[in-house]
């Protein structure tokens, strides 16, 4: 039997740079595995010091789950309270550095974070960084070791947690307070009960056979997409360029859903087979990197809608879905600052008007990100996923050959026609960007601390779209993002069957299940973007007024000093 590791022992190991994760009652050291992890290193870093049982079970199949305990170095025989991972700003010390601190207090702070700390960025020397720690200190919204409750409202008002003199901080604090009011208590025991009910739900989903893929439905999907490509190429041969481009764009839009399913290993449930399917349709036919998307998407699923950590809502300088993004946050995904610069200060206050126009150009940005991922080798370089990079590099090259050379260059008679075909086909894919952002842009972006359970976070930050069954193909499973976030490997065509079970679960644990019609959901997103835009406008106007007042004060002060000097000089004369 492995030895029991105390909370102090575990914190000491993390302080020494070890990648320690809790799975059930096992303590895992993933140092040797993290370089081979097909899902990337960032997703593991966000689980350091945490009980990742629900996350690990949700994202892996049974065969993979049986291998987890290879990395077991000990166990716990006591209820685990999550620590704040270093990548999120957690602070840890070695045993010989702080012997006076007991096991229970190791991850607690003795005081609230000060106002000054929240706006400081201190560079951490490379040799002093823990596993995953950013090059600058990250200050979480909820201080390390604090369990958020409604009592925090008083702390906000007394300026203990953050400085509410900043207009945008007041707004964000109110959003946190709303979440604390509208969602179940973040008490450790209550969140553990929610997690236990979620595990029962997962058992019901499995027992109902909902992990079994319906391949007939996928055959229909491929026939539908193949028909769109066929119509597009036929119209191209007739020189009906505009309609051909629209059909091609619609085919790409539908193809994204196949890649999404394959990336989650939810088609055949075989890692290599599903990735080959996903990479083929994404890079060879669509010109996009599945590897880039998976690296991004895995983190998104774990820290959904966190402005500091989730790349899916980090769209400055074009969009801000949280006022926290007004303060030049350091992205732990991109490892750089997201500057709220002059350009962002012009665009964000009108983002609700620019939302749809900007999404029309979304695919061009995905090309850039895909090539960066492949050329810079940002994906796995070891293990069973290492060869994916070269397959995708060949795929992206082939896409540029067949689309930009064979179709755009060879088939279009003029540069004007080439430009129109490219723009029309890419603008036609805009709808998928609307579908992607619809699920999260209007939802909570609050940081509620490390006690929040996996299921509550997913339900709090995601929304579903209500549509008739016959229209499911159009949304490609993205209309069930709540269910998908709870059970990422569930085949797309079974999500609707799981919906009733999820609704019962939500009713039992007291968590709101958010669902809107497509039009209503878009209205909610635009309304939220407008609210954030108004906050940006107000903050910038306040800054402008303060600057003017400071200038006026300086002017009057200088005038009085000058007058006094003149009078003094006259007296001397």
Curated annotation (Swiss-Prot):
List the membrane topology term(s): Multi-pass membrane protein
Q: Where is this motif: Histidine box-2?
A: 297-301
Indicate where this protein resides in the cell.
Membrane
Give start and end of each Cytochrome b5 heme-binding domain: 2-77
Transmembrane ranges, per UniProt, are 228-248, 273-293, 353-372, 393-413, 422-442
GO terms under biological process:
sphingolipid metabolic process
- Stated role: Delta(8)-fatty-acid desaturase which introduces a double bond at the 8-position in the long-chain base (LCB) of ceramides. Required for the formation of the di-unsaturated sphingoid base (E,E)-sphinga-4,8-dienine during glucosylceramide (GluCer) biosynthesis.
Q: Which PANTHER family match?
A: DELTA 8-(E)-SPHINGOLIPID DESATURASE, FATTY ACID DESATURASE 2
Name it: Delta 8-(E)-sphingolipid desaturase
């Amino acid at each position: 039997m492995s030895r029991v590791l105390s909370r102090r022992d575990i914190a000491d190991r993390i302080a020494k740079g070890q990648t320690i994760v809790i799975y059930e009652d096992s303590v895992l050291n993933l140092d040797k595995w993290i370089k081979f992890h097909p899902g990337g290193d960032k997703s593991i870093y966000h689980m350091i010091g945490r009980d990742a049982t629900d996350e690990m079970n949700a994202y892996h199949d049974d065969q993979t789950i049986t291998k987890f305990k290879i990395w077991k170095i000990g166990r716990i025989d006591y209820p685990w309270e999550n620590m704040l991972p270093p990548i999120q700003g957690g602070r840890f010390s070695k045993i010989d550095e702080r012997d006076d601190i007991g096991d229970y207090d190791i991850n607690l702070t003795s005081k609230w974070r000060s106002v000054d700390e929240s706006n400081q960025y201190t560079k951490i020397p490379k040799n002093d960084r823990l596993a995953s720690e950013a090059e600058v200190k990250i200050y979480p919204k909820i201080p390390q070791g604090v369990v958020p409750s409604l009592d925090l409202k008083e702390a906000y008002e007394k300026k203990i947690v953050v400085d509410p003199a900043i207009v945008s901080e007041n707004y964000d604090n109110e959003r946190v307070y709303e979440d604390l009011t509208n969602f179940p208590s973040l008490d450790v025991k209550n969140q553990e009960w929610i997690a236990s009910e979620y595990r029962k739900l997962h058992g019901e989903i499995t027992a109902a056979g909902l992990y079994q893929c319906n391949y007939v439905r996928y055959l229909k999907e491929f026939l539908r997409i193949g028909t769109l490509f066929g119509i597009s190429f036929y119209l191209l041969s007739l020189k009906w360029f505009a309609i051909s481009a629209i059909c091609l764009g619609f085919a790409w839009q539908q193809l994204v859903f196949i890649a999404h399913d394959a990336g989650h290993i939810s088609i055949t449930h075989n890692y290599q087979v599903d990735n080959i399917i996903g990479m083929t349709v994404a890079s060879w036919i669509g010109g996009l990197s599945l590897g880039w998307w998976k690296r991004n998407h895995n983190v998104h699923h774990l820290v959904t809608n966190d402005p500091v950590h989730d790349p899916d809502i980090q769209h400055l300088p074009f969009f801000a879905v949280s006022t926290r993004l007004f303060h030049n946050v350091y992205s732990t995904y991109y490892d750089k600052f997201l500057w709220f610069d002059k350009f962002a200060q012009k665009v964000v206050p009108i983002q609700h008007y620019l939302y749809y126009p900007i999404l029309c150009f979304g695919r061009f940005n995905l090309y850039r990100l895909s090539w960066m991922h492949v050329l810079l080798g940002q994906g796995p370089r070891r293990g069973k996923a290492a060869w994916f990079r070269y397959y995708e590099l060949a795929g992206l090259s082939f896409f540029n050959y067949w689309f930009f050379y064979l179709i755009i260059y060879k088939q279009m008679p003029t540069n004007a026609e080439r430009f129109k075909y490219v723009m029309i086909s890419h603008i036609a894919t805009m709808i998928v960007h609307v579908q992607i952002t619809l699920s999260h842009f209007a939802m909570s972006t609050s940081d509620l601390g490390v006690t929040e359970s996996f299921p509550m976070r997913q339900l709090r930050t995601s929304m579903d779209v209500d549509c008739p069954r016959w229209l499911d193909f159009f949304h490609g499973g993205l209309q069930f993002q709540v269910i998908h976030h709870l059970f990422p490997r569930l085949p797309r065509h079974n999500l609707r069957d799981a919906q009733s079970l999820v609704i019962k679960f939500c009713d039992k644990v007291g968590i709101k299940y958010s669902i809107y019609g497509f039009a209503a959901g878009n209205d909610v997103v635009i309304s939220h973007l407008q609210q954030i835009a108004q906050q940006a406008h107000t903050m910038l106007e306040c800054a402008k007024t303060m600057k003017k007042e400071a200038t006026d004060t300086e002017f009057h002060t200088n005038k009085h000093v000058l007058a006094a000097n003149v009078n003094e000089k006259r007296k001397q004369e």
